[in-house]
């Protein structure tokens, strides 16, 4: 995620929180195309649990992206009501949180998606789910979550402002945004 964010010159600061330093070291060594950019001066690396990292942070972030694995083992804390409440507090008044929501394709996973959305909805006044087709994910059909204190992902979309940036992206377009 950080690799993509550093492409935008207006991004001033990125805090990357990873529980496993060895994972990052292995990626740097064997998958440099994935780990590239981590030396960018705008990036600060923290090796910590995401929930513990966010506790006590208030009004600090414009955007929180949770690109966690499944809610198993050491990442379970990133799928709790406490975590989403901590994200809410850590975001500025106009901040946005986006996160992996999983695949609703299989019955058990679909139930987890619903459970997760209910937890987020209890913390954020605006909480929506969007979809993408990602062939490398189980079932190829994946959901993501959008949560905000202020912005609705469709009603507040400023397509003209985005288009005026002239940003060339591989996947995202404002039409796709509306359709997802």
Predicted regions and their residues:
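Active-site-proximal loop/turn and secondary-structure-junction residues that shape catalytic pockets
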Residues: 70, 103, 133
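Conserved Class I S-adenosyl-L-methionine
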Residues: 84-88, 110-133, 145
């Amino acid at each position: 995620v950080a690799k993509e964010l550093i492409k935008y010159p207006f991004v001033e600061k990125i805090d990357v929180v990873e529980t496993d330093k060895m994972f990052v070291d292995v990626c740097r060594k064997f998958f440099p195309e994935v780990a590239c950019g981590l030396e960018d001066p705008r990036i600060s690396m923290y090796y910590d649990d995401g929930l513990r990292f966010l506790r006590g942070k208030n009004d600090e972030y414009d955007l929180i992206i949770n690109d966690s694995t499944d809610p198993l083992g050491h990442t379970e804390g990133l799928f709790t009501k406490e975590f989403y409440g901590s994200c809410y507090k850590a975001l500025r008044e106009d901040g946005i949180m986006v996160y992996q929501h999983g695949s609703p394709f299989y019955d058990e996973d679909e139930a987890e998606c619903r459970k997760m959305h209910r937890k987020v909805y209890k913390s954020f006044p605006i909480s929506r789910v969007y979809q993408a087709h990602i062939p490398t994910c189980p079932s190829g059909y994946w959901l993501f979550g959008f949560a905000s204190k202020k912005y609705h992902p469709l009603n507040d979309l400023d397509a003209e402002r985005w288009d005026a940036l002239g940003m060339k992206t591989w996947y995202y377009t404002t039409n796709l945004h509306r359709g997802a």
